[in-house]
Amino acid sequence: MIRKLSITLGRVLRPNDFLGRWRMGDEFIVVLPSTTIEQAVSVAERLRSSVESASKEWLYPTSVSIGIAHYPRHGNNAAALLEAAEYALIVSKQGGKNRVTVAP
């Protein structure tokens, strides 16, 4: 399942974007260099939609919740950006999952 998910996510991203597993579970991190917050939201929506669509053919339908943090608006170092993205992710999950949320 994780492999199918990573392939689906990777198809949406540009060659210079970064996709990697995050933490111990089923979380991923995506870094979108030289991207505006509006572009990041658009990419996140495409990621969410792609997984929703592709997973209809998988054994277990899957959805993704996405939290977005943008440099320098949400922080000027990795720790601050990760904290802001994590907060936005929690808001997405609490809002019913299968959502994209930008950090406040």
Locate predicted features.
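Residue-level recognition of strand-loop junctions within catalytic nucleotide-signaling folds
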Residues: 31-35, 52, 71-72
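Ser/Thr-centric signal marking residues that sit
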Residues: 18, 35, 63
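Nucleotide second-messenger and two-component phosphorelay signaling modules
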Residues: 8-23, 55-59, 95-96
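Short, electropositive, low-hydrophobicity segments enriched in small/polar residues
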Residues: 24, 29, 71, 99-100
